[in-house]
Amino acid sequence: MQQRRRPPIASRETLQALLSEGAQALGVALSDAQRGALLDYVALLAKWNAVYNLTAIRDPRQMLIQHILDSLSIVPHLGAHGAAAAALDVGSGGGLPGVVLAIALPGWRVTLNDIVHKKSAFQNQAKAELKLGNLSVVTGRVETLRPGADVPAKFDVIVSRAFADLADFVTLARHLVAPGGSIWAMKGVRPDEEIGRLPDGARVKQMIRLTVPSLDAERHLIEVELDEAI
């Protein structure tokens, strides 16, 4: 029986072209150094995926599209918080979208959070190898994190990509939102049922339909504002 051939692994030059075109389509300006760091991050994900169980995606080209470009798609919208905001990425896993935010927004201070120590170990490795001085890692349940103790302070932006139901996310993380800050959830299809379960004092400020280059799938970004943070 003839074995099915695996598709060839994309070269770094091919990935760089895909990244450059994708970032331009998203309106995200990246320097050569930032593009290099994002490609190095893809290489780290591909290298250590089997050890750390980071993603079901094995192909670097698909990693670039489904992880890097997907994460870059939120940068223009989060940028409204200014050039020096503090962000918390909840349920970060392999560092998404937090590592991408730390690279694309070098003036931001980004904290990655996960409950799995193995994932945190990879996050720390990525921080060291990519030399991201604006990135920090904290392990533990988000609802137990205390500003001024487990994390330096409250956050302008709290974001998640694949963490939990929207209502649960808001309930667990709302104590960490700084005045004027908000919670952002990256979702696939429009999450109307999840929005209907939002807790008291929380409401959708905006729902943005995202278009991710080379990705044929629905993507939405939901911003939730809180009474206590207004």
UniProtKB/Swiss-Prot annotation:
Annotated GO MF terms: rRNA (guanine-N7-)-methyltransferase activity
Catalysed reaction equations from the record: guanosine(527) in 16S rRNA + S-adenosyl-L-methionine = N(7)-methylguanosine(527) in 16S rRNA + S-adenosyl-L-homocysteine
EC id: 2.1.1.170
Protein localization: Cytoplasm
Keyword rRNA processing annotated: yes
Binding, S-adenosyl-L-methionine: 91, 96, 142-143, 161
Source taxon at top rank: Bacteria
Pfam families reported in the protein's UniProt record: GidB (PF02527)
Keyword field contains Cytoplasm: yes
GO cellular component, one term: cytosol
Keywords noted in UniProt: Cytoplasm, Methyltransferase, rRNA processing, S-adenosyl-L-methionine, Transferase
PANTHER family: S-ADENOSYL-L-METHIONINE-DEPENDENT METHYLTRANSFERASES SUPERFAMILY PROTEIN (PTHR31760:SF0)
HAMAP family the record matches: 16SrRNA_methyltr_G
Sequence similarity: Belongs to the methyltransferase superfamily. RNA methyltransferase RsmG family.
Function: Specifically methylates the N7 position of guanine in position 527 of 16S rRNA.
Name listed for the protein in its UniProt record: Ribosomal RNA small subunit methyltransferase G
UniProt organism field: Burkholderia pseudomallei (strain K96243)
Taxonomic lineage: Bacteria, Pseudomonadati, Pseudomonadota, Betaproteobacteria, Burkholderiales
Gene name linked to the record: rsmG
